[in-house]
């Protein structure tokens, strides 16, 4: 079924992990941060271009730079309190 690889030393283990990681081929032109998917790069680059527009939670007043972060906050934090 599956072959099990035994890696004896730390250097070889780190090398194996590095090779198994997906390549980050998409690079932000503003800060050089790397991404594996073009969509993630596009969302990230918006944080550099956009003015300081903020989205606030109506329940607790916390501010967010991105609307999707506010949406996540509402789902996981604020509504349950």
Swiss-Prot record:
Compartments (UniProt record): Nucleus
Gene3D superfamilies: Classic Zinc Finger (3.30.160.60)
Single GO MF annotation: DNA binding
PROSITE patterns: ZINC_FINGER_C2H2_1, ZINC_FINGER_C2H2_2
C2H2-type zinc finger span: 26-48, 55-75
Domain of life: Eukaryota
Keywords per UniProt: Developmental protein, DNA-binding, Metal-binding, Nucleus, Pair-rule protein, Repeat, Transcription, Transcription regulation, Zinc, Zinc-finger
GO biological process, one term: periodic partitioning by pair rule gene
GO cellular component: a single term: nucleus
Known role: Putative transcription factor. May function redundantly with odd and sob in leg joint formation during the larval stages, acting downstream of Notch activation.
Protein name, UniProt field: Protein drumstick
Taxonomy of the source species: Eukaryota, Metazoa, Ecdysozoa, Arthropoda, Hexapoda
């Amino acid at each position: 079924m599956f072959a099990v690889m035994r890696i004896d030393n730390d250097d070889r283990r780190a090398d194996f992990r590095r090779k198994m990681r997906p390549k980050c081929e998409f690079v932000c032109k503003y800060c050089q941060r790397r991404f594996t998917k073009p969509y993630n790069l596009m969302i990230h680059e918006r944080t550099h271009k956009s003015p300081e527009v903020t989205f606030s939670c109506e329940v607790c007043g916390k501010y967010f730079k991105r609307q999707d972060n506010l949406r996540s906050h509402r789902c996981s934090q604020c509504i349950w309190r």
